[in-house]
Structures are given as structure tokens and as C-alpha cells.
Amino acid sequence: MRALPLNIGTIHFVGIGGIGMSGIAEVLHMLGYKVQGSDIAEGANVQRLRQAGIVVHIGHDAANLGDAQVVVTSTAVKKDNPEVVAARAKLIPVVRRAEMLAELMRLRWSVAIGGTHGKTTTTSLVACVLEHARLDPTVINGGIIEAYGTNTRMGSGDWMVVEADESDGSFLRLPAVIAVVTNMDPEHLDHWGTEEAMQAGYDQFVSNIPFYGFAVLCVDHPQVQQMIPRLSDHRVITYGFSPQADIRAEKVVMDKRGATFEVVVTNRQRNRSRRAGPFRLPMLGHHNVLNSLAAIAVALEMEISDSVIASALTTFKGVKRRFTRTGEYNGISIVDDYGHHPVEIAAVLKAARQAGARNVIAVMQPHRYSRLKVLFNEFCTCMNDADTVIVADVYAAGETPIEGAGRDALVEGLRDRGHRSVVPLPDPAHLAEMINAIAKPGDYVVCLGAGTITQWAQALPAQLEALNRQPATEGAA
């Protein structure tokens, strides 16, 4: 198979610390390519790459290019970035992240997982099952897989599992043999323009698979189900809770540690059905059962046995920032979650209920003014499973403020729609005091967002302990 030549020269990543960029850089490095990069700040991904032997500069400067022969950028990197400007002045190719990922995918048979929500967890689940099947996959994910401690895995097998990013349409470049679509909600309309254009993009993503490949679609989601007749010339496997699904979950039992369920497997070509399982998934929420069904569908089509699938799911350790418990104080559980879309937020809060929370306290840091504006009504109605909602300032992610799409507007919108307990967060420094005043043993504090709120969630258990630590008795030895 023709592939990216090893003598291509130094590959320089602008914004190498990003979750998507770091994974590609790490795999290229492990394959023997000379990789370097830069980022605006230190971080866990930067530290990990340095430990792997990759040179990372902090700050963007034309001098960082050195002897680079290729420059890789993401959509977060502006055209006037000094390193990009210098590369173009030197006639060095500037490559988009997805294009470099596509080159890596040409080295293997690839599974690409797309969708508005659940991509990272589903990618991790597929990788886990393939690993248990001894297929030794290479993995490039959009989140940290707890079992690996990183978002990548370098395997020697024939398969690669990747998370497909739809935010800028770049997933249309990916040469997948198996394409998964978990769901399709309005998101990233700043790129797509309209929902119709976004749907057409997903159609193309799946249509790109070769005739010997197949698509795995969540039939529970109406927009995804509507794709099926448009893909009549492709092999399509559906999954979900729907009686119409080829891979259908039944007898789902939720407890405080996860879910147990059986699966009805229907082969429409042979008009046969059989029952598989039970399967045990140590993750909360019906949305994660759906994610596991996608992995089961992929695995069964690859002729992986039920027992191997069951073993993989049972041992699955999850993904960082997906209902991750950062600690506990006085019976109060602190949870960190990446959820920043209304559908994700509603699913996470429901999972907290299923975990047995006495009360659920949601701490929300909205991510991007544009998202809050476009989905304002949805944000105002997705918090019903939270007894109390604490709303922080919007994490701008480089955007300028938009009137009517800020913290106070969201607080008012939630109250107007009937939520009985919504309060603004004056400043992150006040969070521990606010939680200390309202949380009781058995409560769950769920921190939601894609910005800096993860740092608050990590610090909160120790901050609560410090607030309640009794001062030393005067005169004590």
C-alpha cells in the first residue's frame, strides 16, 4: 500500500497540544517520522509528547519551524499565525489535520466514528473490543482513554480506529472502510450553515466507504434513520432500542455502577434473529448503552465472538471527562464531564440520577457564545434533572460576546421556563463556598463544559475539605 514516505522530512504541528493534533503527532512519531510542534501553553498533552521524545515549543514564532518540510494545522489555527505565514513564504506545504489523519488511515483498514455526541466513548469502546479480539488496533481518539492514559494507541494489526471530526467538514476526507454515525443534532452550524447541509455532509461521510465496507447507524435518532434510504447502495447495520434495529438492546437494568443488558441480533439478509449476552457495561446512562451497541455492531460484522465482546465491555475503563469522578467530600460526589451540548447535558444529568444521587447540583460553563445563541432554548430546557443549576460565565474559546447569549441571560431563561433553583456563579473562586452551602451527603455535583471547568472539578474536593477543616485549638501542642 502506498503511504506517506518516511523521508518526507520534519513534520511541524502548529497547536500540537490540541487533543486531535497530539494524537496524530504521537502516532507519526511512533511510526518513525520526525515530528515537532508548538503550542500557546503548557499542558498535559504537551508534557506527554515531550516524554515521548517530541520537541514542543511554547509560543508561536516563525523560528519554531526550523528545518520543517511539512506544516500541519487545525481549524483553531488562524491564517495569520506567524508559523503558517512563514511556512507559506518558504513554499512549505501547509496541511490540515484531517488530511494528515487521512494519510495515516491509508496505512490500515479503518473504522471512523462520527456523530454529534458519543464519538469519543464509541471510538474507545470499538478500540477496546478490537484489542480484546487480539486485532492489535491503532487508535486515534478525541479524548483520553483511561486504559491507555492517552488518546492514542500504536498497534501492529491491520485495523485503525479513529474519531471523525464533523465540526469543519474535514471528516469527508477520511478513507474509512467502516463508518459509524451515533446521532445528528444541530451543531457547528457556523461551518455548515444549515441543518440540511450538515445532513448532506453526513451522507457523504458514509457514502465514501467502499462497496466492501459497511455503515453502522443509530436508528433511534430520527435524522440518522432518515439517512438509510439515501444509502440504499451501501451495506447498513442499524442499532438502538428501537424494535426496528438490527442490533437491539433489551432487558436493560441500570444500577449505581453501570448497565446490564441483552442484545437481539437480526440478520435481515437471512431473515434470522438470535439473542446475545447478557453484557455488562460499567458506565452509567442509556446513552452509553447505545454507544456500546455501536461497538457490538462493528464487532459482530467483523465476526468477533459474543464472549470476546462481553469480556471487553466488562473491563472497559471509560474515557477521561466522561462522567469522571474527581473525588468525594463528606459523602458529596464531584463529577467532571465534557458535556457542552444540551443533548449531552441532559444525558449526563439523567445518568447522575441513575447513579443514585440524593440531589443533583449542575455547575455549567457554557462553551462559545455562538453555540449558546443558536441553541439557547435547548440550553434553557436541558437541566430538568438538576435540582440546582449554577451557571458560570461563557468560555469564549476565542469568540467575542454576543448580546443575549451570556451567563445572566441563561440564568433568566432557565428561570423563565420553570426551573426552581438557578444561580449565577460570580467567579470560579466562589464555587467551593457555594457548593459547601447547599450540598449534602449523597448529593452529586456535576461540572459540565468543554472549557476550564475541568480544573474547577479537579480542585473542588480539596477545596471543600479545606473549608471545613477545623482550625487548630489555641495552645495545643
From Swiss-Prot:
GO terms for biological process: cell division; cell wall organization; peptidoglycan biosynthetic process; regulation of cell shape. It catalyses: UDP-N-acetyl-alpha-D-muramate + L-alanine + ATP = UDP-N-acetyl-alpha-D-muramoyl-L-alanine + ADP + phosphate + H(+). InterPro entries: Mur-like_cat_sf, Mur_ligase_C, Mur_ligase_C_dom_sf, Mur_ligase_cen, Mur_ligase_N, MurCDEF_pg_biosynth, UDP-N-AcMur_Ala_ligase_MurC. Its EC number is 6.3.2.8. One of its GO terms (cellular component) is cytoplasm. Belongs to the MurCDEF family. This is UDP-N-acetylmuramate--L-alanine ligase. It comes from Gluconobacter oxydans (strain 621H).
